[in-house]
């Protein structure tokens, strides 16, 4: 029976060693999966973010200040949320007025409804300026 106990003790040790090696094997799996993707020639869809634009605005406002990647992620989520709210409101306005198209007028009204007070006024003026610049060029 002592001989039976010793192999029983060794098996947990043997089980622990592969358990430690599993994360390494796990790291190798994505490489194998990536190789599989290369064989299929499936291109990865580019994730669209506003990070470069947020950074450009930050440098215009505060050239000496940086931003962490976590804060950048939060800002990107914030922009996505605001745009989603504006799109939903503009869509609702177009539906109410039985219009098939969302125009700059619907966007402007959505901005006035979604954004509070002074922020809405500034957003409308900047939006009007951008549309004028776009149509003139």
Curated annotation (Swiss-Prot):
Q: How is it modified after translation?
A: Can be acetylated to formH2BK33ac and H2BK34ac. Monoubiquitinated to form H2BK143ub1; may give a specific tag for epigenetic transcriptional activation.
Alphabetically sorted, this entry's keywords are: Acetylation, Chromosome, DNA-binding, Isopeptide bond, Nucleosome core, Nucleus, Ubl conjugation
Swiss-Prot/TrEMBL induction comment: By gibberellins GA1, GA3, GA4 and GA9.
Q: What is the lineage of its organism?
A: Eukaryota, Viridiplantae, Streptophyta, Embryophyta, Tracheophyta
Pfam families for the chain: Histone (PF00125)
Glycyl lysine isopeptide (Lys-Gly) (interchain with G-Cter in ubiquitin) crosslink: positions?
133
Which family is this protein grouped under? Belongs to the histone H2B family.
Can you say what this protein is called? Histone H2B.3
The record describes the protein's role as: Core component of nucleosome. Nucleosomes wrap and compact DNA into chromatin, limiting DNA accessibility to the cellular machineries which require DNA as a template. Histones thereby play a central role in transcription regulation, DNA repair, DNA replication and chromosomal stability. DNA accessibility is regulated via a complex set of post-translational modifications of histones, also called histone code, and nucleosome remodeling.
Q: How does it assemble?
A: The nucleosome is a histone octamer containing two molecules each of H2A, H2B, H3 and H4 assembled in one H3-H4 heterotetramer and two H2A-H2B heterodimers. The octamer wraps approximately 147 bp of DNA.
| Chain positions with N6-acetyllysine modification | 27-28
Q: Which domain of life is it from?
A: Eukaryota
Question: Where does tissue-level expression of this protein occur?
Answer: Ubiquitous. Highest level in shoots, fruits and young flower buds, including petals, anthers and ovules.
Please give the GO cellular component terms listed in this UniProt entry. Answer: nucleosome; nucleus
Where located? Nucleus; Chromosome
């Amino acid at each position: 029976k002592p001989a039976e106990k010793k192999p029983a003790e060794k098996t947990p040790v043997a089980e622990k060693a592969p358990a430690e090696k599993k994360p390494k094997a796990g790291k190798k799996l994505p490489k194998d999966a990536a190789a599989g993707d290369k064989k299929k020639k499936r291109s990865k869809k580019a994730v669209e973010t506003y990070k470069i634009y947020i950074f450009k605005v930050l440098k215009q406002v505060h050239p000496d200040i940086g931003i962490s990647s976590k804060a950048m992620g939060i800002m990107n989520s914030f922009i996505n949320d605001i745009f989603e709210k504006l799109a939903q409101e503009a869509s609702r306005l177009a539906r109410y007025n039985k219009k098939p198209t969302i125009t700059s007028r619907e966007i402007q009204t959505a901005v006035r409804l979604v954004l509070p007070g002074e922020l809405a006024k500034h957003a409308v003026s900047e939006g009007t300026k951008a549309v004028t610049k776009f149509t003139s060029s």
